[in-house]
Amino acid sequence: MSVTLHTDLGDIKIEVFCEAVPKTAENFLALCASGYYDNNTFHRNIPGFMIQVHEHLHTGDPTGTGKGGNSIWGKKFNDEIRSTLKHNSRGIVSMANSGPNTNGSQFFITYAKHPHLDTKYTVFGKVIDGADSTLDMMEKVPVDEKHRPLQEFRIKSVTIHANPIADKQL
């Protein structure tokens, strides 16, 4: 199972770990299928660390703090931490949260290996195409003192490849 994020700076194809983290995968894929991430900006960009997707269009979070965003169930959901899924390379995709069991809709992609994130954030995917081109361009975008990109760029749309939840009632 994979999705492609079509961004202003290029495409990022992500393998989604549906079997390992089924609830997180279901949430992410359903949000992708609904157009939830379409036109959302990347609001936090820390070179050498990660880039995070903003939810301003859907949560009304004018602060750009990344603390907004609900799951498909309308509330936060529990972590699915797996010892086999680690922040061990560039391109790891994880849920952003504000503490244990507070996953919603926000996610981030790592720019490098960050083992200190293991056991704190649910890993649900890995970039399988675009890590050497699109992520490189994103990482080079200048940021302000709060790590907000000075050049706005967005997820224009998302393509889902072989969606296993398409036949499920949500």
UniProtKB/Swiss-Prot annotation:
Give UniProt keywords alphabetically.
Isomerase, Rotamase
Q: Does the keyword Cytoplasm apply?
A: no
* EC code(s) of this entry: 5.2.1.8
According to the entry, every stretch annotated as the PPIase cyclophilin-type domain falls at 1-160
Function (record text): PPIases accelerate the folding of proteins. It catalyzes the cis-trans isomerization of proline imidic peptide bonds in oligopeptides.
Species of origin reads: Rhizopus delemar (strain RA 99-880 / ATCC MYA-4621 / FGSC 9543 / NRRL 43880) (Mucormycosis agent)
Q: Which reaction does it catalyse?
A: [protein]-peptidylproline (omega=180) = [protein]-peptidylproline (omega=0)
Q: Which GO terms describe its cellular component?
A: catalytic step 2 spliceosome
Its family remark reads:
Belongs to the cyclophilin-type PPIase family. PPIL3 subfamily.
Lyase is among the record's keywords: no
Question: Which Pfam family is one of this chain's hits?
Answer: Pro_isomerase
Upper lineage is: Eukaryota, Fungi, Fungi incertae sedis, Mucoromycota, Mucoromycotina
Annotated GO molecular function terms are: peptidyl-prolyl cis-trans isomerase activity
InterPro entries with a match to the protein in the record: Cyclophilin-like_dom_sf, Cyclophilin-type_PPIase, Cyclophilin-type_PPIase_dom, Cyclophilin_A-like
Q: Top EC class per UniProt? A: isomerase
**Name of protein:** Peptidyl-prolyl cis-trans isomerase-like 3
Q: Which Gene3D superfamilies match?
A: Cyclophilin-like
